[in-house]
From Swiss-Prot:
This protein may be expected to contain an N-terminal transit peptide but none has been predicted. This is Translation factor GUF1 homolog, mitochondrial. Residues 82-270 form the tr-type G domain. GO terms for molecular function: GTP binding; GTPase activity; ribosome binding.
Length: 684
């Protein structure tokens, strides 16, 4: 009888069940490779022999050595405050923050090299598609370093890295991240140099009294000019060129100097180990299985699983069900000590309970709340409605789930005569609105219509009352009291541009009602302009115009400025004399005619023709400032006539004429959803 030879995979499987690691040499697998099957004991033995992160990655310099092994059991008690460094990476958009974060995680063995996912800390699909960071993310690393201060003794440091967004809309995420840090890496592109968001982020860190380590990235590029960038940093921020680090996150060049600089230049956390517990709540998101997961920074004291804690803002009490670090995924450690950053699970069922910037402390202890930080101020408002008017419940569910993970969006229910029931949402900026819309569609499958973005205005009346308007339809066209003054929000805009585009940009800013406050040259090729501008002029399409004029070379950033008095009017769009609330807008009187003409022309293109003539008008109160006429469809009522008396034809035509008059008098114009889609598309 011929012998039957068991397949190699089956042999490996049986060996693993017996608790012996499989060699699998003939199958092409390494002797200590990790099989996906087998008993727990066998799997543990295999893991002990060959760590999944790819073995040790020893990288040494004169005074430091990086340990390449990912710790199986993390004991946070081994890391007192003097062995902890909390730092963040801040930079302009696309200057390489997330790529540098990847290299540092690989360097310390936190993730394996070539993990198959570039920008590891960019978790959201929208972040990967757009190549931007939207949510700040935290990761803990461990690093062996021989410090001169300890006489060359090798010490293991705990480093908390926070990767922050670079876009102006998400500067709130940056400010939250900096609250948990003692220092930052200020990253600058070696080719592009200092940009607008570089300036804004530097002053955020400077005002927070953080240690700043300047790093010039992308020095491997052909057009890199590190010396030129050093001189820019010296001129704008008075940074010593000798303190600047040079690196390429893409190739790893100069990377070994960054973490030693973090340890040497950034101070340890200042908290007190023996004091009562105080934690700063940095961020929160909703998990379907564990409820709300909070990211926290322990300022004073110690937090352990089973502790009872209380919120300083809501005075609600919770029990710590799970506590740990992000290594880089959630890793349960059972404890967090002074100066450490991690996560807690408390059984909260809604992110509304987790107020960002709140102080958490042990129940029945008396502590002084931490300063926290200002709540996010919403700069742009827009209506969000279901594409299918009857699908409100599905939209409501999607919005509720998404806002669980994005607490910076404000939500209020509203009703529109044209679009049905929806929500009035407040956003940090246009990109934030775009990202919210995209996440609704991608993550929750909701098809929505987003109305034209508006900004919050203040209207003052003769009786002394003040009305803040976020939705133009809510402003009465004929108020009972006389309007005394109107105020609109403004921003302080910073533009950094090649000097040949300065004239064109000055013209653009003047057309947008901007007032110049500063004009200076950074070097021989680039200038910095500062303007105070109305926020409405910025949120419509200013950024696109700026990029178009400068061929994409200019960078733009803005920060909040006080309200200013302005000559504002409400512009209504009428169809056959009936106002369409979803198309109402508030604009400056000098631009009302232009805006009204543009809207009327667009409506004429997207509306279906009716059996009667449709008048499309733009009006300020009772005064019509623009008009377009949509001609009626003509039905051939004479088709059934084959000659004969002309009076018969005349009678049919007169009857049709009377019918059209009657239809025009009582007929309503239905605006199809497709028309709203094309008309209200952002940027139109």
């Amino acid at each position: 009888m011929p012998s039957i030879r068991a397949p190699l995979a089956l042999t490996s499987f049986l060996l693993s069940l017996s608790g012996k690691p499989s060699t699998c040499v003939r199958s092409g697998l390494a002797a200590n490779s990790r099989p996906w099957f087998g008993s727990i004991a066998g799997r543990n033995r295999v893991l002990a022999n060959a760590p999944w992160w790819g073995g040790k990655a020893e990288l040494s310099t004169d005074n430091s050595v990086v340990s390449g092994g990912k710790e199986e059991n993390v004991d946070l008690k081994q890391y007192p405050p003097h062995l902890i460094r909390n730092f963040s990476i801040i930079a302009h958009v696309d200057h390489g923050k997330s790529t540098l974060a990847d290299r540092l995680l690989e360097l310390t063995g936190t993730i394996r090299k070539g993990h198959g996912q570039p920008q590891f800390l960019d978790k959201l699909q929208v972040e990967r598609e757009r190549g931007i960071t939207v949510k700040a993310q935290t990761a803990t690393m461990f690093y062996n370093y021989r410090s001169k201060k300890t006489g060359g003794a090798n010490e293991r440091f705990l480093l908390n890295l926070i990767d922050t967004p670079g876009h102006v809309d998400f500067s709130y995420e940056v400010s939250r991240s900096l609250a948990a840090c003692q220092g930052v890496l200020l990253l600058v592109d070696a080719a592009q140099g200092v940009q607008a968001q570089t300036v804004a982020n530097f002053y955020l860190a400077f005002e927070s009294d953080l240690a700043i380590i300047p790093v010039i990235n992308k020095i491997d590029q052909i057009n890199a000019d590190p010396e030129g960038v050093k001189s820019q940093l010296k001129q704008i921020f008075d940074i010593d060129p000798e303190s600047v680090l040079l690196t390429s996150a893409k190739t790893g060049l100069g990377l070994e100097n960054i973490l030693p600089a973090v340890i040497e230049r950034i101070p340890q956390p200042k908290g007190l180990v023996d004091a009562s517990l105080r934690m700063l709540l940095l961020d929160s998101y909703y998990d379907e299985y564990r409820g709300v997961i909070c990211h926290v920074a322990v300022v004073d004291g110690v937090l352990k699983r089973g502790d009872k804690i209380e919120s300083a803002a809501t005075r609600q009490s919770y029990e710590i069900m799970e506590v740990g670090i992000l290594y880089p995924e959630l890793t349960n450690t059972g404890i967090l000590l002074t100066g450490q950053v991690g996560y807690v699970v408390t059984g909260m069922r809604s992110t509304k309970e987790a107020r960002i910037g709140d102080t958490l402390f042990h129940t029945r202890s008396v502590v002084e709340p931490l300063p926290g930080f200002k709540p996010a101020r919403h700069m742009v408002f827009a209506g969000v409605y279901p594409a299918d008017g009857s699908d409100y419940e599905a939209l409501s569910s999607a919005v509720e789930r998404l806002t669980c993970n994005d607490a910076s969006v404000s939500i209020a229910k509203e009703t529109s005569g044209a679009l049905g029931i929806g929500f009035r949402c407040g956003f940090l900026g246009l990109l934030h609105m775009d990202v919210f819309h995209q996440r609704l569609e991608q993550e929750h499958g909701a098809q929505v219509i987003t109305t034209t973005p508006t900004v919050p205005y203040i209207f003052e009346y003769s009786d002394g009352s003040k009305l803040t308007i976020q939705n133009p339809a809510a402003l009465p066209s004929n108020p009972k009291s006389r309007l005394v003054a109107c105020y609109e929000p403004t921003v302080m805009a910073t533009i950094i541009t090649p000097s040949e585009y300065v004239g064109s940009l000055m013209t653009l800013c003047s057309e947008r009602r901007g007032q110049q406050t500063e004009y200076s040259f950074i070097d021989g090729q680039r200038a910095m302009l500062k303007y105070r501008m109305p926020l409405r002029e910025v949120v419509i399409d200013f950024y696109n115009e700026l990029k178009s004029i400068t061929s994409g070379y200019a960078s733009f950033d803005y920060e909040e400025a006080p309200y200013q008095e302005s000559d504002l009017v409400k512009l209504d769009i009428l169809l056959n004399g009936q106002p369409v609330d979803a198309l109402a807008s508030i604009c400056h009187r000098s631009k009302a005619h232009y805006v009204g003409r543009e809207l009327c022309e667009k409506l004429k293109k997207v509306l279906d023709r009716q059996m009667f003539e449709v008048a499309i008008q733009a009006a300020i109160g009772a005064k019509v400032v623009a008009r377009e006429t949509l001609p009626a469809l003509r039905k051939n009522v004479l088709a059934k006539c084959y000659g004969g008396d002309v009076s018969r034809k005349r009678k049919l035509l007169e009857k049709q004429k009377e019918g059209k008059k009657r239809m025009k008098r009582v007929g309503n114009v239905d605006i199809p959803q497709e028309a709203f889609h094309s008309l209200l598309k952002t940027g139109n």
